[in-house]
UniProtKB/Swiss-Prot annotation:
Function, in words: Molecular chaperone. Has ATPase activity.
Lineage: Bacteria, Bacillati, Bacillota, Clostridia, Eubacteriales
Protein name: Chaperone protein HtpG
GO molecular function: ATP binding; ATP hydrolysis activity; ATP-dependent protein folding chaperone; unfolded protein binding
ATP-binding recorded as keyword: yes
Domain of life: Bacteria
Predominant place of localization: cytoplasm
């Protein structure tokens, strides 16, 4: 038995494989199981071309055998096996893929699904082992061979004894240290967990001897342990089954099994795409919002599989942020993986899949809004805010994608309505889509600014979330109808001539009020929108009063202020008191003006700038 050196730069490359390529030790089992699956696939392919051979799938499986006494973990398969030459060529040369070589030699086209691509997966065993022993017998061969290496000083190949074709890979685990407990890879629960996590959908049974408990024969309460071989993996993934044969319960159970959520999802999508891109997917729209959804801890992403093998637990590239609530899986053979299969190469295929998924989700939501309004409103209650963030984010790049999914509470319908539904009901003479901003529907209904719009019979949309107005400002218009806040300076329904006349007739008192308030407001003018209230605040420019409130509450705010206009109802009896005070008692006039301004602030939900001064003014008024 001679000692053989790894070929060419293989020794250095092996060190890179062990220490640099793989970032997660536990994937060694995924790699070795995938290799075992490929080996069985090769037997199947051999039998296709030889009528004298048969392939009974029930005879083929992968066995995982931990040995705690010897601290070894064995992965066995009933696969194609290797000759002495193949052992030397495949395991003596790092990064030579025996699977790819097999495809070339047998002129196999891409339809034959072999997982291995790079020829390094076997060496991931050195992540947890300081020695690897391989005992193998090639399909149709008489002799078996043993390959052995410590991953440092080359390897040896010698003849061995093995009854049937296939391969046993024996990992001699490293000694435990302060940082790593390698013994955990001998524990039944850990092995089952890794198989379910990474290799649940390998097409052949993965078997493990499992310790179970039962009532001892002849007793009532005495239990005994026994060992039973158990198939751990599911084998046939749900997404590869005929969707016409699946029930809602099948999808719901899968949702819970994958721990996407513990309640029933609101909707599921089973997608199978072939063509320029090929992938299978099952996507879920949750009914309830995850507890951490609007926190930094939440991670979006779909489980990503390649040929049924888990590559990434959360592939964020497959979902835009505004659809980050979607759960599910994607399986594709067309992905360009990096050498460790832990990460993706950024390529067109991934982008195409992501684009296709985005379209599928949008279509599903539009269908839900149209055909199952009750379910859509449940969804929107949980995730509507995220859609509105999507409109606002990235400088409005996605606004056209999302605008038809938005809904707001309607003053006329007393329920949530879409923008399309609002526009369809607009009066012929109505120029704008009107909205009001407030902390709640009840608060908005008491706003003095709504009076004139409602008197015209126009509908008002209620914006009660902090993102609402920011999203609409980014949207700007819908079906060529501009959005207009009821608190804006010009509603488009006032009589310009009457306004001009009112402002000219009361120019003196308005100038005096502006002088009393100073820089707190940009102007005082007559209001045509008020009926029952003496004053209200409106705004001019891009920043509304509500936006000022939101921005001022943010850390490191830049002191952004709305240009506030104090509008005065010249038909209100308080206005007569103001005129009298201006003529007879300027101090009282200034007091009235300040009180009216503070009243307008309170109605808007804004803080009074000087509460002590305000209470003193009230006391003066009561003397």
């Amino acid at each position: 038995m001679e000692k053989r050196e790894f070929k060419a730069e293989s020794k250095r490359l092996l060190d890179i494989v062990i220490n640099s390529i793989y970032t997660n030790r536990e994937i060694f089992l995924r790699e070795l199981i995938s290799n075992a699956s490929d080996a069985i696939d090769k037997v199947y392919y051999k039998t296709l071309g030889d009528s004298s051979l048969t392939f009974n799938k029930d005879d083929y499986y992968i066995k995982i055998k931990p040995n705690k006494e010897e601290r070894t973990l064995t992965i066995s398969d009933k696969g194609i096996g290797m000759t002495e030459k193949e052992l030397d060529e495949n395991l003596g040369v790092i990064a030579k893929s025996g699977s790819l070589q097999f495809k070339k030699e047998n002129e196999i086209k891409d339809g034959f699904d072999i997982i291995g691509q790079f020829g390094v997966g076997f060496y991931s065993g050195f992540l947890v082992a300081d020695k690897i022993t391989v005992i193998t017998k090639a399909f149709g061969a008489d002799k078996a061979y043993k390959w052995e290496s410590d991953g440092v000083d080359g390897y040896t190949i010698s003849e061995a004894e093995k009854d049937s074709f296939g391969t046993d890979i024996i990992l001699h685990l490293k000694a435990n240290d302060e940082d790593e407990n390698y013994d955990e890879f001998l524990e039944e629960y850990k092995l089952k967990s890794l198989i379910k996590k990474y290799s649940d959908f390998i097409r052949y049974p993965i078997k493990l001897d499992v310790t179970k408990s039962r009532v001892k024969e002849g007793t009532e309460n005495e239990h005994e342990e026994y060992v039973e071989e158990e198939t751990v993996n599911s084998m046939v993934p749900l997404w590869r089954r005929n969707k016409n044969e699946l029930t809602d319960d099948d999808y719901n159970n899968f949702y819970v099994e994958k721990r996407f959520g513990f309640d029933k999802p609101l909707r599921h999508m089973h997608i199978s795409v072939d063509g320029m891109i090929s992938y299978n997917s099952i996507l879920y729209i949750p009914e309830n919002i995850p507890y951490d959804y609007y926190t930094k801890e939440y991670e979006k992403g779909l489980e990503l599989y390649s040929n049924g093998v888990l590559i990434m637990e959360k592939c964020s590239e497959l979902l835009p942020d505004y659809f980050g609530f979607v759960k599910g899986i994607v399986d594709s053979q067309d992905l360009s993986l990096n050498i460790s299969r832990e990460m993706l190469q950024h390529d067109r295929q991934l982008s195409r899949i992501a684009k296709n998924i985005k379209t599928k989700i949008k279509n599903e939501l539009e269908s839900m809004m149209k055909n199952d309004r009750e379910s859509y409103e449940k969804f929107y209650k949980s995730f509507g805010r995220q859609l509105k963030y999507g409109v606002y984010d990235d400088f409005g790049m996605n606004k056209d994608e999302l605008k038809d999914l938005l809904m707001f509470y309607s003053s006329k319908e007393k329920k949530m309505v879409s923008l399309a539904e609002y526009v369809e009901r607009m009066a012929e003479d109505q120029k704008y889509i009107y909205y009001a901003v407030g902390e709640s529907n009840e608060r908005i209904e008491k706003m003095p600014q709504t009076e004139m719009v409602l008197d015209k019979g126009y509908e008002i949309l209620y914006f009660t979330e902090d993102v609402d107005e920011f999203a609409i400002k980014m949207l700007m218009n819908y079906k060529e109808k501009e959005f207009k806040s009821v608190s804006s300076g010009d509603l488009g329904i006032e009589s310009e001539e009457e306004n001009k006349k009112e402002n000219e007739e009361n120019k003196g008192i308005f100038e005096a009020m502006k002088e009393a308030l100073g820089e707190k407001i940009s102007a005082v003018k007559a209001s045509s929108r008020l009926k029952n209230y003496p004053v209200c605040l409106s705004s001019e420019g891009e920043v509304s009063i509500e936006m000022e409130k939101i921005l001022s509450a943010m850390p490191n705010n830049q002191g952004v202020k709305a240009q506030k206009v104090l509008e005065v109802n010249t038909n209100h009896e308080v206005f007569n008191s103001l005129k009298d005070a201006l003529e007879n008692d300027r101090d009282k006039f200034n007091l009235y003006t300040k009180l009216l301004y503070n009243q307008a602030l309170l109605v808007e939900g804004l803080s009074i700038e000087d509460p002590v001064d305000f209470t003193n003014d009230i006391c003066k008024l009561m003397k």
